[in-house]
Structure formats: structure tokens, C-alpha cells
Amino acid sequence: MLVIDALGRKCPIPIIMLAERIREIPVGQVVAVLADDPAAHTDVPAWCRMKSQEFVWEEPLPQGGWGFHIRRSY
């Protein structure tokens, strides 16, 4: 699984990193985005809806922030 570490970066940087790197994984695979900017909590799911990518789940990270899991749809 591809992990994108965007901890410490402010939005829209985590979204830009996701948009650039999701192409590195095959369709059907999952990418994890680690982010601690509160805006990412709404921006990542919104990006998935806009780009027709599957938002699988999110989990809180022990150090703060979230791990967002997105399945590449196309």
C-alpha cells in the first residue's frame, strides 16, 4: 500500500500530494494519506467525491491527525 505522509503540511498540500501520487498505484488498490491539518478531514473526502475515487475509511493517528484510505477507481 502506498502511504503519503502529509503530516505537518497545510491544505491544499495533502490533496495535491494525493492527486499526484494516486496514479502510482494500480486501479483497485488503496493509498493511505496521513494528515494532521483539520481541513484535510473534510477536504480528502470531498476530493474523492469530486474525482470519483472511493473513500474507504479514516482512522485517528496516535500522534494526532488521521489516516485516510482511498481506493483508486480508475
Language model: regions and residue ranges:
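Conserved beta-strand segments of alpha/beta enzyme cores
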Residues: 2-3, 54
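C-terminal structural segments of small proteins and small subunits
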Residues: 44-74
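Amphipathic, hydrophobic secondary-structure cores in small proteins
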Residues: 9-55
